[in-house]
Amino acid sequence: MNEKMDVLFGAYIAVKDGKISYIGKTLPEGQPATIVDGTGMVAMPGLVNCHTHLASTVLRSYLDDANHAEALTQQLQKESKMDRRSAKASALLGIAECLRFGVTSVSDLYYYPDATAEALAETGMKGNVALSAYRFIDESEEFDFETDEQCRELVNIKEKWHGYEDGRIRVDGGIYAEYISNHKLWEGIADYCADEGLGMQLHLATTESETEDCLDRTGLSPAELLNCHRLLNVPVTAAGCAALTEEDKAILGKKKATAVVTPCANAKNSLKSAPIASTVKAGINVALGTDGAVEAGNLDMFEVMRQAAYGERVAQCDPAKLPAAAVLMMATVCGARAQGRSEETGMLKEGFDADLILVDFTAPHLMPCHNVITSLVFSAKGGDVALTMVKGKILYQAGRFPTIDLKNVVEEITGYAIPKLLEESK
C-alpha cells in the first residue's frame, strides 16, 4: 500500500537494516538471512493506534456496564492506587495485544509515561507517549514550570525517552482535558512543547455536555479556549472531537491538528462519535484509535476501522461518504502523520521503516476476496494477523512474542497489579 493504494499480487518485499529495501514482482537479489512465506497472506503497513491508554489495560471489563460518568469516576478512583510497577505490567499486556492485532505504533496518553516508554523500549514497538497532566491551579497561586511536579515529569521523560532508538519512541506534551486543568498549566506545557519541538495529546469535545459546560463557564468552546492559551500552537492530536462546533473545526483545520475518532469505545459507552466527513472537509487530519481497553473492551484496530465506516455510512446514508480506502488510510497514513512519522512509516514503500504486518487471507471469513482493500476493512479481524514487524524486527508471529515474556506479564498482572488497584481499595 502506497500513496496510490496500489495492490500487488505475488510480490516480494525485502528488508535490510530495518527498512524496506525492495518491493517488486521479481525475486530480489542476494541471499536473505530470513525468509517468511507469505503465501495466502496480505502484506500491509502496520496499523497506528492514535489514542490509547496502555497502562489501564489491567482494568479491562471492570466497569463495562456503568454509564460514562460513573465509569470515569470509578476508574479515576482505581487509578489513584496505581504505581509504576503495575503501570508497566499493564502496558506490557496492552502492547502484546496491540502487536497481536497488527499495531506497530501507538499514541499513549496516560499516567506513568516513563513506565509505558520503558515497556515500548523493551518490546520493540513504536510509540508517542504523553503524560495525561491534570490539576487546577488557584488563580492566586504562583505557577512555576520548573518546580511544578507534572511539568518536571514531562521534562524528565522528554530528556530520557524522546528520540530513543532513532525516534522509535517519541514524547509529546499532554493534558487530560480542558475541564480538569486550567490555563496556567496549559500555557506552561504549550510553551515547553513549542520550544522543544514536541507534539501535544489531549481529549477534546468528547461529549456535547463537555462543550456546553465550557461555553457556560467561559463563553468559549473547549477548542477556542485551548487555542487562546497556546495549546494549539504545536501539532495537536485531539481524541474525541464528537462535539466540535463549526468554528472549532475551522480552528483545528487552520492549525493542521489531528482529530482521533474512537468509534468502538464511544459506542460501548453510549457516546456519539465525531462526524468524519465534515471533519475531514474542514482540513483536519482524521486518524483512528481504540481508546483504552477499559473504554473499548479490546485494542483491535480492525474493529475500529469497520465501526468507523459503519457509523459514518449510517449517519450519512451514503457509503460513498467514507470508502474503505479512506478508512484504511486513517488507520495508517493519517496516524503516522499525527505522530510526526509520515516520512518513515504508514506505507509500504522502499526506504520507509519496515513496519508491516501479514494478514492471513486463507480463513473462511476472508474467502473469496474480490477486493483486498474492502476485505481488510469489512471482513478482517485482529486475530487474522499472522506477523507483526517493526523496523524490520519480528515482534509477533504465529502466537509467539519474541520480545515479551507473556507468562511473566500475566503473573505480574494477576499477582501484583490487580491486587494493587482493586483489592486494596475495597
Language model regions located:
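Active-site microenvironment of metallo-dependent hydrolases
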Residues: 1-11, 16, 26, 331-426
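Divalent metal-coordination and catalytic microenvironments
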Residues: 13, 18, 40, 51, ...
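Active-site gating loops and adjacent loop-to-helix segments of metal-dependent hydrolytic enzymes
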Residues: 58-89, 128-148, 208-233, 255-258, ...
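Alpha-helical scaffold segments that flank or form the walls of functional sites
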Residues: 60-125, 150-164, 414-425
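Metal-coordinating catalytic core of metallo-dependent amide/deamination hydrolases
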Residues: 117-242, 247-249
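His/Asp/Glu-enriched, well-ordered alpha-helical/loop segment
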Residues: 228-235, 277-363, 379-380
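C-terminal active-site-proximal or functional interface alpha/beta core segments in diverse enzymes
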Residues: 238, 243-246, 266-273, 298
